[in-house]
């Protein structure tokens, strides 16, 4: 019997993160380990038996949908931001959301599993690169002996440069950030949340993070926070 050309996937969970919009989300999972997220199962899958033994793993894979970048069609080539936004590469040589099946794959740290009476087991994760409310279709344990490839070739990503910025912020302004969010927000800002092709030192950028509206400018390797307001 031949396999069907299409299949239906069920959303098993949604993730809660500090990012209500796409802007500012780290470009890959694991870049900001202090970012906290909660994976909350949909009612059908709120079964403690389904996660039995998962607590013995330190990391998990999340299979999710690019729900913030849904298109009716796909493109065989895309322009990765890390290449300046002008060079085209085959979509299957990238992690672009504009693919035939808009699925993402992220490796995150599993900090703990909380069992809550209202929503069942909740996975507390660190280092996710997902927007708040992103639907998750599957999760699997990360298995080091099979999933880790230290000698793997990195393709065009080996040629790109990650900009690690120095963050500068007035102490009084920074005090507006709750203490339990400061490390995560600093990590996001130091990883340069700007689009890779934008380098105007006079431009003021704004991003939403954990109920805050954060504004900043970047000049060279220094990011200066210019405003933090509660939304």
Regions found by a protein language model. Give the residues of each.
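Active-site-adjacent substructure of cysteine-protease-like catalytic cores
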Residues: 50-104, 197-199
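Short, conserved beta-turn/loop elements at beta-strand boundaries and strand-helix junctions
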Residues: 20, 113-120, 130, 221
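Residues located in well-ordered beta-strands
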Residues: 14, 106-111, 124, 135
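Short coil-to-beta-strand transition motifs
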Residues: 4-11, 98-108, 210
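Arg/Lys-rich, positively charged N-terminal/basic patches that mediate binding to nucleic acids
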Residues: 1-48, 54-56, 142-188, 196-197, ...
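Short solvent-exposed strand/turn elements
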Residues: 118-142, 230-231
């Amino acid at each position: 019997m031949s396999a069907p050309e299409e299949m239906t996937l069920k959303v098993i969970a949604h993730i809660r993160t500090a990012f209500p919009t796409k802007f500012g989300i780290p470009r890959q999972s694991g870049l900001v380990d202090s970012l906290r997220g909660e994976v909350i199962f949909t009612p059908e899958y709120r079964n403690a038996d389904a996660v039995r033994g998962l607590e013995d793993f330190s990391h998990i894979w999340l299979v999710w949908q690019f729900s913030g970048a849904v298109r009716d069609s796909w493109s065989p080539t895309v322009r990765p931001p890390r290449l300046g936004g002008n060079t085209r590469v085959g979509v299957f040589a990238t992690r672009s959301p504009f693919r035939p099946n808009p699925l993402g794959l992220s490796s995150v740290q599993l900090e703990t599993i909380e069992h809550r009476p209202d929503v069942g087991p909740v996975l507390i994760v660190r280092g996710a690169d997902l927007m708040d409310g992103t639907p998750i279709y599957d999760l699997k344990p990360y298995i080091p002996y099979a999933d880790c490839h230290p000698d793997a070739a990195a393709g065009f990503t080996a040629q790109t440069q990650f900009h690690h910025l120095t963050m500068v912020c007035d102490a009084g302004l920074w005090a507006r950030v709750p203490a339990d969010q400061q490390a995560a927000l600093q990590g996001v800002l130091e990883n340069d949340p700007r689009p890779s092709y934008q380098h105007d030192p006079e431009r003021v950028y704004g991003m939403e993070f954990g109920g805050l509206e954060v504004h900043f400018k970047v000049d060279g390797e220094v990011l200066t926070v210019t405003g933090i307001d509660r939304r």
